Structure formats: C-alpha cells, structure tokens
Amino acid sequence: NPEAVMLFYDSEFGSPLQYFASVGIDPTRVLHIPVQNLEELKFDLLKQLQACERGDKVFVYVDSIGNLASLKEVQDATDEKSVSDLSRAKFLKGFYRIITPYLRIKDIPMVQIGHIYMTMETY
C-alpha cells in the first residue's frame, strides 16, 4: 500500500533505506527504529501499537527477532558469566501475548525474521 507506514525494527543494520526503494517501497514511509535487545523491542512496539487506530495503514517489520539478546543475556556477558539464558523463551511467549491482541484488533500485519535452524551441520 503506497499510503502505509512501515515500522522497521532493526537489530542487524543490514538493510539501508535505499534497499526499500529498490523493491518499490518509498523510504520516506519507513520509520527506522534500531533496537539492541528484546526489551527495547517490546517497550517501543507496544507504545507504537497503542498509539495506532484501527484503519491506520501500518506494517511492522522486525529484522531480526532471532538475533536479539535479552537484557539478562547482555548483563551475563558484561559480568563475564558463561550461562544459558533460559528466560528468553518465556520472554518471547509474553511478548507475543502482549502484542498479538493489538495487531489483530487494529488489523496491523507484522513480519519477523527468526533465524531458527533445526540443525547446524551446514554452518
């Protein structure tokens, strides 16, 4: 939709705005929102969705949710702890519980890149 606005949550910084123009998306209609962790994504996306009205022409794109660390994971690395972040899956489940009603009620599509692999043999 040429009248729509894209909320582009970017954690990989590999898609310059010129890329969108090359595939027919007006870059002036792309709101580039850099995020560094899952919490930043959750808080900002929730705020943006709450401000939207049903019928607003908004599209949400996240690149990539699979590449985002949680604040706990970042803090563990800062503290030089080599532990697994077992809270990430629980966080993501809560994230979807919070945002899904807003997306559905307001008819806002969201596409996310996930980076999930069944096996790692080829990497």
Locate each region found by the language model.
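Phosphate-binding/switch region of NTP-binding enzymes
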Residues: D85-Y123
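Conserved inter-motif catalytic segment of the P-loop NTP-binding fold
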Residues: P2-G94, I98
